[in-house]
């Protein structure tokens, strides 16, 4: 008897999906290019569809609690459920799959906390390695593991695709719900960048650039 299983990657809820689930409404999906060219008309249509609901209020809610659909099953204990999920990923999933000891798992958690309280471009690998208490080589391995586990988002400078550039990498928590759950007072700018990166990275590779915030390339 052969056991068969299928694997499917399910991204976090987008802001659109969160609002649709919460309000039981349907909104047309939009390509980024169309949003950039026709954002006024699109915004007016959305506002009409929302009727008396305030879009900014719903956006503020999404930033805090919108990434994972189990929010709608248990709203009162949602933050604790997110923290429990993080611990499950760290101690059960990563610990078992990669045979990581408990002290190293604690270093992974310390890495998440360090990213949480820092501005993305203020982080250097050297200083981060010191905070976590590990070598640069090991730190890069930790970053890769957390990126694969979708707890962390690793964004490199666009120029690094072509040549060696002395530019620091940007590290974010993977989505704004993680940021809001792990950080007491997340910075507004970091929340906005984390939101944008989490929405676009589902179907795009993203880089940071000198002019503007991000460059996207189709995967």
Predicted regions and their residues:
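Accessory nucleic acid-recognition modules appended to NTPase machines
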Residues: 72-218
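Interdomain motor-coupling "hinge/lid" segment immediately C-terminal to the ATP-binding subdomain
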Residues: 1-106, 116
């Amino acid at each position: 008897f052969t056991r068969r299983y299928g694997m499917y990657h399910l991204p976090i809820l987008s802001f659109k999906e969160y609002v649709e689930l919460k309000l039981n409404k349907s909104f047309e999906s939009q390509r980024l290019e169309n949003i950039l060219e026709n954002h006024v008309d699109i915004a007016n249509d959305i506002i009409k569809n929302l009727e008396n609901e305030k879009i900014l209020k719903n956006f503020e809610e999404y930033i805090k609690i919108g990434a994972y659909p189990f929010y709608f099953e248990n709203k009162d204990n949602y933050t604790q459920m997110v923290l429990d999920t993080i611990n499950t990923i760290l101690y059960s999933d990563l610990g078992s799959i990669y045979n990581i000891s408990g002290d190293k798992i604690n270093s992974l958690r310390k890495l998440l906390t360090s990213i949480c309280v820092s501005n993305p471009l203020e982080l250097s690998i050297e200083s981060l390695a010191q905070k976590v208490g590990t070598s640069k080589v090991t730190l890069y391995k930790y970053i890769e593991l957390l990126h694969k586990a979708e707890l962390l988002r690793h964004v490199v400078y666009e120029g690094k695709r072509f040549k060696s550039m002395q530019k620091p990498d940007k590290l974010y928590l993977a989505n704004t719900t993680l940021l809001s759950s792990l950080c007491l007072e997340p910075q507004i700018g970091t929340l906005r960048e984390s939101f944008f990166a989490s929405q676009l990275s589902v179907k795009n590779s993203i880089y940071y650039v000198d002019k503007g915030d991000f460059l996207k390339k189709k995967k």
